[in-house]
């Protein structure tokens, strides 16, 4: 992909890039009262023009009428405006009203047909396009959407991490799964990465911590929903912060250096990294030993006509390892994730053992 760095298409860029404004543009009065208090704190004002809801019957946006309100405000008080587009018609209207930045929503990213239509509508466009992660943690879909826009000649590209849907109980509206966007950034280092703490959190009190975590991970910017009266918002009321509090939130965030510069710190860092490398080696050696033992168990089960999956054994492992984790002051959820991965690999390994033996038997019968 051909990707321009954020500083090359947003000349005023100073980390972090801030995109903020109401979830939905509800009325002209609400837009003004939500936006005016934050204009000196943001790079782009965001606002939902169309708001497709999970189920019909709720407020779904004002459409072109809301863009007219935005245009009226921009004539009086210049600012850059960002909005979501989901159809070629949305793109056409965005161009008509001189919108400054577009983003692609999670529900759109998940559908390659929709993305292809939008990419065609934006063929060769210079307007920046940010692509939100798909609803579920499918990195290939996220990359595929970005690649479609890149092939259409859109060079001012970026990605928005808004978290992922999960059926697991969580304090978040969408679980962060930080490693997924970091994998994307690792593959495309120039790609601007923006965090949407509002959609990850689902609750205003969680927004600052998520925003700080994103900056700790060297994200390029933040998209935060702000409303003049969040408790009266027509959509996503629980996750929008009061507009007058945006400045306090931003002032409370700590910016980290992108790299170490002092020699004494670098020297100490290298010592710690060597210890981490050694610890990782020991972990991998332990996993290798475990897989060898799993293979032996697979052979023993096959020879004695015993099923691969033993529920009682799995429950025993699941419970005892959590107790061990607690004794070692390790996060239980983290340990459970590791256990599930190890168990999946163990089942796969034993299945391969069963299949290998059957193949040998078939060969000998030939």
Predicted regions and their residues:
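N-terminal amphipathic alpha-helix/helix-capping segment at the start of soluble metabolic enzymes
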Residues: 1-20, 251, 261
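Active-site mouth loops of central-metabolism enzymes
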Residues: 16-33, 56-59, 80-85, 105-106, ...
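Hydrophobic faces of well-ordered beta-strands that scaffold small-molecule active sites
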Residues: 16-22, 43-47, 81-83, 102-104, ...
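Catalytic domains of carbohydrate-active enzymes, especially glycoside hydrolases
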Residues: 33-49, 97
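Glycine-rich, proline-tolerant flexible connector loops at the mouths of alpha/beta enzymes
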Residues: 46-65, 228-237, 297-308
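Catalytic beta/alpha-barrel core
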Residues: 60, 79-87, 91, 100-115, ...
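Catalytic alpha/beta core domains of metabolic enzymes, predominantly
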Residues: 114-245, 252, 257-264
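Domain-level signature for soluble enzymes in the chorismate/prephenate branch of the shikimate pathway
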Residues: 258-366
């Amino acid at each position: 992909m051909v990707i321009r760095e954020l500083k090359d298409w947003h000349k005023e860029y100073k980390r972090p890039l801030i995109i903020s404004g109401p979830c939905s543009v509800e009325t002209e009065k609400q837009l003004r009262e939500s936006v005016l208090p934050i204009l000196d704190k943001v790079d782009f004002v965001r606002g939902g023009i169309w708001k497709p809801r999970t189920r019909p019957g709720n407020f779904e946006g004002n459409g072109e009428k809301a863009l007219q309100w935005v245009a009226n405000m921009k004539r009086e008080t210049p600012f850059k405006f960002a909005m979501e587009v989901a159809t070629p018609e949305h793109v056409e209207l965005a161009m008509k009203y001189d919108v400054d930045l577009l983003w692609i929503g999670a529900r759109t990213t998940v559908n390659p047909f929709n993305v292809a239509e939008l990419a065609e509508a934006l063929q060769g466009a210079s307007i920046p396009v940010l692509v939100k992660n798909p609803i579920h943690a499918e990195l290939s879909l996220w990359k595929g959407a970005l690649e479609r826009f890149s092939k259409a000649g859109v060079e001012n590209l970026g990605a928005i991490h808004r978290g992922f849907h999960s059926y697991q109980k969580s304090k978040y509206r969408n679980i962060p799964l930080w490693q997924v966007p970091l994998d994307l950034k690792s593959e495309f280092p120039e790609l601007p990465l923006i965090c949407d703490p509002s959609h990850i959190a689902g609750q205003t009190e969680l927004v600052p911590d998520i925003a700080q975590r994103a900056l700790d991970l060297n994200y390029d910017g933040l998209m935060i929903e702000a409303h003049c009266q969040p408790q009266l918002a027509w959509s996503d009321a629980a996750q929008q912060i009061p507009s007058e509090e945006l400045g306090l939130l931003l002032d409370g965030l700590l910016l980290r250096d992108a790299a170490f510069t002092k020699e004494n710190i670098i020297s100490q860092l290298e010592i710690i990294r060597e210890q981490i490398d050694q610890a990782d080696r020991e972990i991998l050696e332990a996993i290798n030993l475990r897989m060898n033992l799993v293979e032996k168990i697979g052979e023993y089960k096959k020879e004695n006509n015993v099923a691969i999956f033993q529920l009682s054994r799995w429950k025993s492992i699941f419970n005892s390892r959590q107790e061990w984790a607690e004794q070692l002051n390790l996060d239980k959820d983290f340990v459970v994730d590791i256990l599930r991965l190890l168990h999946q690999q163990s089942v796969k390994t034993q299945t391969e053992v069963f299949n290998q033996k059957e193949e040998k038997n078939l060969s000998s019968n030939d």
